[in-house]
């Protein structure tokens, strides 16, 4: 798809659990939709560099960084980790497409990955991720569609109670400029220099799975801080990403099936309006 005009969705697993890409595809007929959300707790930098090599002028990149893994999602380090090699198992040659001189810890991460892999029971490469659910259990219908969305039905939660005791901080103090904003802008600017339009919509999170300091005023201030400093076009307010916990399944940032429908409709509305403002056909 390198030569096809496309919309690439990028985040961690909240993206593969967070979009109805078929609905996006229908709303944006000029673009092929690709969901590249995999795992937030590995460095996003090498992932995005591999993605950037496949994008062309006029393509759209829609980011939705996960704040519970902010250091990795905002490129605060160039270090490799073993999880990156897990994602490369289908084609180890993709590692050679990166300029490894730009990264640290490559061989230590590889060693850690190989050690872990050696202790695991071998599985057939004929088995696709779509043959298994998120917990590794075999399923009768594909768990992923052709876009990369996780599509097994996920019911709403019975109430809004957070799943994990991990209250994420949505305050400006948690995102100092030099640590988070500067490296993020450096990567975003590489895409822009290639003619790729870069947009941001915040990743969804259970509104009760935030810190006590993350008051509505603090959330609004953080949104304003990002808008003032990040070199991207913002589609939606930060507050809109904090949703009732009933619309999540299994974690505080994986949406239920109903949550996906709601969130995708919000993104479609915001993105199509922004493209119209820019004079671009959806």
Language-model segments: residues:
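N-terminal secretory targeting modules
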Residues: 1-6, 282
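Second-shell loop/turn segments in exported
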Residues: 9-10, 35-38, 170-177, 187, ...
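Residue-level recognition of beta-strand->loop/alpha-helix junctions
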Residues: 35-37, 202, 236-238
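Loop/turn elements at helix/coil->beta-strand transitions in domains of secreted/extracellular proteins
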Residues: 4-6, 29-32, 56-60, 192-199, ...
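Secreted/periplasmic serine-hydrolase-like ester/acetyl group-modifying domain
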Residues: 80-194
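Membrane-embedded segments
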Residues: 10, 14-97
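C-terminal regions of proteins
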Residues: 213-282
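Active-site segments of SGNH/GDSL-like serine hydrolases
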Residues: 188-214
């Amino acid at each position: 798809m390198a030569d096809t005009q496309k919309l690439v969705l990028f985040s961690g697993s909240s993206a593969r659990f967070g979009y109805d890409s078929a609905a996006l595809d229908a709303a944006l007929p000029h673009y092929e939709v690709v969901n590249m959300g995999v795992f937030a707790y590995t460095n996003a930098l090498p992932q995005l560099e591999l993605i950037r090599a496949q994008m062309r002028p006029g393509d759209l990149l829609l980011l939705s960084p996960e704040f519970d893994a902010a250091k990795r999602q905002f490129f605060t380090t160039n270090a490799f980790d073993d999880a990156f090699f897990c994602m490369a198992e289908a084609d180890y040659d993709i590692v050679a497409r990166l300029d490894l001189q730009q990264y640290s810890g490559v061989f230590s991460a590889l060693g850690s990955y190989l050690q872990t892999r050696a202790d695991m029971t071998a599985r057939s490469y004929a088995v696709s991720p779509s043959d298994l659910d998120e917990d590794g259990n075999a399923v009768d219908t594909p768990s992923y569609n052709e876009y990369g969305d996780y599509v097994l039905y996920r019911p709403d939660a019975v109430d809004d109670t957070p799943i994990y005791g991990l209250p994420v901080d949505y305050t400006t103090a948690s995102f100092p400029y030099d640590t988070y904003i500067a490296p993020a802008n450096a990567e975003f600017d590489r895409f822009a220099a290639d003619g790729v339009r870069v947009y941001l919509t915040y990743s969804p999170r259970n509104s009760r799975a935030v810190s006590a300091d993350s008051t509505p005023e603090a959330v609004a201030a953080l949104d304003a801080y990002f808008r003032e400093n990040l070199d991207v076009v913002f589609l939606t307010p930060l507050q809109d990403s904090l949703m009732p916990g009933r619309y999540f399944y299994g974690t505080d940032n994986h949406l239920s099936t109903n949550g996906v429908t709601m969130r995708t409709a919000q993104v479609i509305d915001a993105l199509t309006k922004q493209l119209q403002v820019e004079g671009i056909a959806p």
